[in-house]
UniProtKB/Swiss-Prot annotation:
Function: The RuvA-RuvB-RuvC complex processes Holliday junction (HJ) DNA during genetic recombination and DNA repair, while the RuvA-RuvB complex plays an important role in the rescue of blocked DNA replication forks via replication fork reversal (RFR). RuvA specifically binds to HJ cruciform DNA, conferring on it an open structure. The RuvB hexamer acts as an ATP-dependent pump, pulling dsDNA into and through the RuvAB complex. HJ branch migration allows RuvC to scan DNA until it finds its consensus sequence, where it cleaves and resolves the cruciform DNA.
Keyword DNA-binding among record annotations: yes
NCBIfam families for the chain: ruvA
Similarity field: Belongs to the RuvA family.
Domain of life: Bacteria
Name used for this protein in its record: Holliday junction branch migration complex subunit RuvA
Stretches for region Domain III: 146-203
Region (Domain I): 1-63
Domain II as annotated region, ranges: 64-141
Annotated source species: Streptomyces avermitilis (strain ATCC 31267 / DSM 46492 / JCM 5070 / NBRC 14893 / NCIMB 12804 / NRRL 8165 / MA-4680)
Gene: ruvA
Compartment(s): Cytoplasm
Location of the region described as Flexible linker in the Swiss-Prot/TrEMBL record: 141-145
Length: 203
């Protein structure tokens, strides 16, 4: 198992980063919030989880070991693959997911694209004894502040979660006032949650 990768960031894409390790570029799939903390040419260390399929090897990257552990635990529930687990962590912090599961907060899970009411109920039952209690007081969405490119990151995140370009455009426009109100440091995680709420209302 590849537990982490460490090295300069060689490339950034809407849903992934390339970290140079020993002269080799390692592609790592990341949430928008993880990507928002990376900068081209700067050193980065990401906890990782390797997902092995018949026709592919995919490395997922996280800000810390706790996020990685939750990513792996989520996949122990039936119907949850790496893409859905990553989508859940794009919308909620690990602690917010623990809190949602421990309190039976169905709405928090339905806020994740790809999870309906019945799916949320099933996940609450299956994950209740697996995620454990919240470790701290983290909010319902990841709050890493970013100073530039929030529109591009948010748009790419929505496309990655399966929304059409038109829907992503409308959602980005809808949350623009919230981003502008935050001044120079809009938080992509909070904007993503607001955008998803907007999309859920219009569907």
């Amino acid at each position: 198992m590849i537990a982490f990768v460490s090295g300069p960031v060689a490339a950034l894409a809407p849903d992934s980063a390339v970290v140079e390790v020993g002269g080799i570029g390692i592609a790592v799939q990341c949430t928008p919030n993880t990507l928002s903390g990376l900068r081209m040419g700067r050193e980065a260390k990401l906890a990782t989880s390797l997902v092995v399929r018949e026709d592919s090897l995919t490395l997922y990257g996280f800000v810390d070991d706790d996020e990685r552990q939750v990513f792996e635990l989520l996949q122990t529930a039936s119907g949850v693959g790496p893409r859905l687990a990553q989508a859940m962590l794009a919308v909620h912090t690990p602690d917010a997911l623990r809190r949602a599961v421990s309190t039976g907060d169905e709405k928090a899970l339905v806020a994740v694209p790809g999870i309906g009411k019945k799916g949320a109920q099933k996940l609450l039952l299956e994950l209740k004894d697996r995620l454990g209690e919240p470790l701290g007081t983290g909010g319902p969405a990841i709050g890493r502040a970013v100073t530039t490119g929030w529109r591009e990151q948010l748009h790419a995140a929505l496309i990655g979660l399966g929304y059409a370009t038109r829907e992503a455009d409308e959602a980005v426009a809808a949350v623009a006032p919230q981003a502008e109100a935050a001044g120079g440091t809009p938080q992509v995680g909070q904007l993503l949650k607001a955008a998803l709420q907007t999309l859920n209302r219009t569907r």
